[in-house]
Regions:
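Gly/Gly-Pro- and Ser/Thr-rich, intrinsically disordered tail segments characteristic of DNA damage-repair
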Residues: 1-275, 282-285, 426
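Short aromatic/hydrophobic contact patches that present stacked aromatics
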Residues: 144, 380, 414
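A short glycine-rich, hydrophobically flanked beta-strand micro-motif that places a catalytic Asp/Glu
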Residues: 177, 181, 336-340, 413-415
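DNA-contacting surface of Y-family translesion DNA polymerases
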Residues: 7, 228, 238-410, 421-425
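C-terminal helical/tail subdomains of lipid-metabolizing enzymes
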Residues: 417-419
Length: 426
C-alpha cells in the first residue's frame, strides 16, 4: 500500500511566536529574535519572512542585520524628496506603500521556555487528528506525520487533511506553516524544503507541495545546488562535484553504471545517498520510534571574552541551560542530572583584591602559569525530565554550591546534562 507522509515546518517559528505575543502579523512584521544585550556578533535565532525578503539570512548575526538595514535605508532615503524620512515603520505593507518611511525592525529577546510551551501546544493540536505513534518530532518547529491510516477515516486526501491541520494551528495560535507531502519520509521533507519554497503561498501564507518518486525525478533531478537536499552537506556536495556529479540525477546515473565508485567515496553512507538520488527511503516512523539513542549526554561550552564574575556567569549558564533543554525537547529526550565545569586562566587572578581573597587551590596551566583549580560539580534531578522549570528550580541553584564556582571570575564554562535517554518524562 502506498503511504502518505507529511512534513510540517512552522514558519519562522521563534519570530512568529514573538509577533503573535505582540499582537502583530508574523508574515508582515519586520522582527528578529536575538539578545541585543550581548554583542552585535550574536546570532539571530529567527527572522520574519518580510525581513528575509530584504536579503537578510535566517541565521544572520545581529551586526549583519544592522548593516543590511542601513544599506536599505540609504537607498530609500535617496528616493525621498529632501532626503529626510517622514517616519519609520516595521510593518512591511506600510513600508511598501510609503517610500518616505524608514525601514525599522523589532529585536526580540529569546524566550526558550515560551517557545517550548508553544511547540507543546501545537503538538497537542496535531494529536486531535492523529495518534502519537504516527508522529515524529524532528525539531521544536518541525514534525513528520504518517497520514496513511487517517485518509479513509476523514474521507480526505493527504493535501486536504494537511490543510485542515495547518489551518487549525493557524486559528489556534496565529502561526502558519509550510508542508511537504510524499510517498516516503524523504520525499515529504524534500517537497517541503525545496518545492514548497518555490510556490506562491495561499491567503493564509500556507505553502503545500507534493512529490512522488516519479515527480521527484522529473522535477528535481536537475535541481542545484546539491546542498538543498536533505542530508547533503557542503562536504558531500564538494566531493560529488569533484567527481563530476552536480545534481541528484548525476548521482542516480553514476549509481546505475558505477555504484562501486560511490561506495569508495562515502563508504556505507553511499547506500542512503543512492536511495535518495532515486527518491527512495526505506525508513518509516515506526523504525524511528524503535531506535534507541546512542549518546548518554549532551553538552555546551563557551570561552568568554574575559573572566566573568559569578553574577554574570549565572546569566550565561542560564542561557546555556535553556539551549540544552531545547535540544532535549527537539530530540524527544530526557535527563536526570546536570553537570557544571568552570575553568580559569591567569586573568582570573589579575585583580589584586580578588587574588588576595582567593583561598582555594592553585594549579599550573599548559604553559606552566599559576591559575585557580577548575571547579566541577553535578546535581542529580531525582527523576528523568525535559522540564525547563524543574531543571532550573532543582538544579540551577544547587549546582553553584560546588567548591570554587563563586570564588573568582571564570573564563571557561562547560555545562552538560547526563543520563540522557529516549523516553517519557516521569
Amino acid at each position: 500500500m502506498e503511504r502518505s507522509y507529511v512534513s510540517i515546518d512552522l514558519k519562522s517559528f521563534f519570530a512568529s511566536v514573538e509577533c503573535v505575543e505582540r499582537g502583530l502579523n508574523p508574515l508582515t512584521t519586520n522582527l528578529v529574535v536575538a539578545d541585543s544585550s550581548r554583542t552585535e556578533k550574536t546570532i539571530c535565532l529567527a527572522v520574519t519572512p518580510s525581513l528575509k525578503s530584504y536579503g537578510i539570512s535566517g541565521r544572520a548575526r545581529l551586526f549583519e542585520v544592522v548593516q543590511r538595514v542601513g544599506e536599505i535605508n540609504a537607498a530609500r532615503r535617496r528616493k525621498v524628496p529632501g532626503g529626510t524620512f517622514t517616519g519609520k515603520s516595521y510593518n512591511d505593507p506600510e513600508l511598501k506603500k510609503n517610500s518616505a518611511l524608514e525601514l525599522d525592525y523589532i529585536v526580540a529577546k529569546p524566550q526558550m521556555s515560551h517557545y517550548i510551551e508553544m511547540s507543546t501546544r501545537i503538538y497537542d493540536i496535531y494529536m486531535k487528528y492523529v495518534a502519537p505513534e504516527d508522529v515524529h518530532v524532528y525539531s521544536i518547529d518541525e514534525v513528520f506525520i504518517d497520514l496513511t491510516a487517517y485518509l479513509k477515516t476523514y474521507g480526505l486526501t493527504a493535501r486536504e487533511l494537511t490543510q485542515r491541520i495547518i489551518l487549525d494551528v493557524l486559528r489556534s495560535t496565529g502561526i502558519t506553516a509550510t508542508a511537504g507531502i510524499g510517498t516516503n519520509l524523504y520525499l515529504s521533507k524534500i517537497a517541503m524544503d525545496i518545492v514548497a519554497k518555490h510556490i506562491e503561498p495561499d491567503a493564509d501564507g500556507v505553502r503545500i507541495a507534493e512529490l512522488t518518486e516519479q515527480s521527484y525525478r522529473e522535477q528535481l533531478w536537475e535541481h542545484r545546488p546539491l546542498t538543498d537536499f536533505w542530508r547533503v552537506g557542503r562536504g558531500y556536495a564538494k566531493k560529488l562535484e569533484a567527481h563530476g556529479m552536480y545534481t541528484m540525477g548525476d548521482v542516480a546515473l553514476r549509481a546505475e553504471y558505477d555504484e562501486d565508485s560511490l561506495y569508495k567515496l562515502f563508504g556505507v553512507n553511499a547506500g542512503l545517498l543512492i536511495d535518495h538520488a532515486w527518491g527512495y527511503e526505506p525508513c518509516t516512523i515506526a523504525d524511528i520510534k524503535a531506535y534507541r539513542h546512542g549518546s548518554s549526554s549532551l553538552g555546551s561550552g563557551q570561552v568568554l571574552q574575559c573572566p566573568y564574575t559569578f553574577d554574570k556567569a549565572r546569566i550565561i549558564v542560564r542561557e546555556m541551560t535553556e539551549q540544552l533543554v531545547l535540544e532535549l525537547v527537539e530530540k524527544r529526550l530526557v535527563t536526570d542530572q546536570i553537570i557544571l565545569d568552570v575553568g580559569y586562566d591567569i586573568e582570573s587572578l589579575s585583580r589584586r583584591e580578588i587574588a588576595a581573597q582567593y583561598k582555594g587551590e592553585v594549579v599550573r596551566d599548559h604553559y606552566g602559569r599559576q591559575v585557580p583549580k577548575p571547579a566541577h560539580g553535578s546535581c542529580p534531578l531525582g527523576r528523568q525530565t525535559d522540564s525547563l522549570k524543574l531543571i532550573m528550580d532543582a538544579g540551577f541553584g544547587r549546582i553553584w554550591e560546588i567548591d570554587g564556582a563563586k570564588a573568582v571570575p571564570g573564563k571557561y564554562i562547560d555545562l552538560s546534562i547526563s543520563g540522557v535517554d529516549v523516553g517519557i518524562p516521569e
